[in-house]
Each structure stands twice: as structure tokens, then as C-alpha cells.
Curated annotation (Swiss-Prot):
Function text: Specifically methylates the N7 position of guanine in position 527 of 16S rRNA.
Gene Ontology CC annotations of this record: cytosol
Protein name as annotated: Ribosomal RNA small subunit methyltransferase G
InterPro entries hit by this protein: rRNA_ssu_MeTfrase_G (IPR003682), SAM-dependent_MTases_sf (IPR029063)
Key words of the record: Cytoplasm, Methyltransferase, rRNA processing, S-adenosyl-L-methionine, Transferase
Similarity section: Belongs to the methyltransferase superfamily. RNA methyltransferase RsmG family.
Amino acid sequence: MTRKALAAGLADLGIDLPDEAQQKLLAFRDLLLKWNKTYNLTALRDPAQAISHHLLDSLAILPHVGSGNLLDVGSGGGLPGIPLAIARPELSVSMVDTVQKKTTFLQQAVIELALRNVTVHHARVEEMQGQYAQISSRAFAEIGLFISLTRHLLAPNGRWLAMKGVRPDDELKALPADIAVEAIIPLTVPGLDAERHLIILKAGS
């Protein structure tokens, strides 16, 4: 039933993944729930809910993820970074979190799932270096703070991908004048009865 629920959800999202990737997604779900008993990585305990609220919710943004390297900020339990990395093995994904128990879990997940395209950083994002074509966040911070903490890491012509619940109009109105909202995309996540939006932003010249 679990496998069927995942396959049906992916079909609803218009995402076609090979069996191996689907098996890895479920293995990640199992690993997350196993470690959650000790590390408190997520409030969810139900395996079926974890498919909709974690796996499918993360993958709902997949059609809007480009080919350039991606930094996932405040990755926590690896969402959306690990599902994206499983679905797109050619995509270079870096994940950063300040909480050591979370990055310990992420490093173990990378090893157990053999994710060669993922790098884990235990650090404060404002102290990181490098350049990323895409910077994502899910339940990390208010959009203005997310941008100010990561702006030095955004490559020229790069994009921020901010995952939000209800449309964050107040946050968008408060953005600096040189930040452009490229798109506000309502997301429909199978099995998730809640508003979801992807906000895509760019830095002005």
C-alpha cells in the first residue's frame, strides 16, 4: 500500500521516477522515522502521512528546480534536499543545518542511501562560502531573513526557492527593492489538505 500511495502521488504530480528512485524515497522515509524516535527530527510519526507531508510535499517543487547546483538551507530532516537529490541524481545538492544531531542524521542518510550527489554542512549559513545557482528553504525563516542570510551565496542569475504554506503577501511586501519575485506558484500536494506555495525570487542588478 505504501508503494502504491507513493506511485499514485508521483503520478498526480506528473513526476515519472524509476523503481530504484521510488525505493530510495521509501528507504529515506523509513530512516527518517527510525531516527526520529531518538532525534526528534519531525513531528510526524505516521508512515503514510510521511509520504504526503514529506516526500510528495518536497517533490512538488521538482518541476521548478533547474540544473544548477542547489543549496538547501535549514535542511533539518533532509527536506526537500534528499527527495530532490534522489529524484535528480545528476543534481548537485548541498544541505546545511546548525543543529549537529540533524546533520549527523543527514550524513548517515547520505551513506545508507548511497547519495553521491549530496554534501552535508554543519554550519551557520551566513558563515558559509561558495556560489549556488539555486537556494531552497522549507519552513526555515521569513523570506526576507532567508534572503539576507544567503545572498552572498547566490550565484549571478541564481534563484531562491522558498517553500511556504499560505501565500506570504506580507513577507513579499517587506522585501528589499532590489529583490524581484519571479513567480508565485500554488502547489497541490496529493494527500495534503493545506495551502502550499513556491516563491521564486531573484536579485536585481
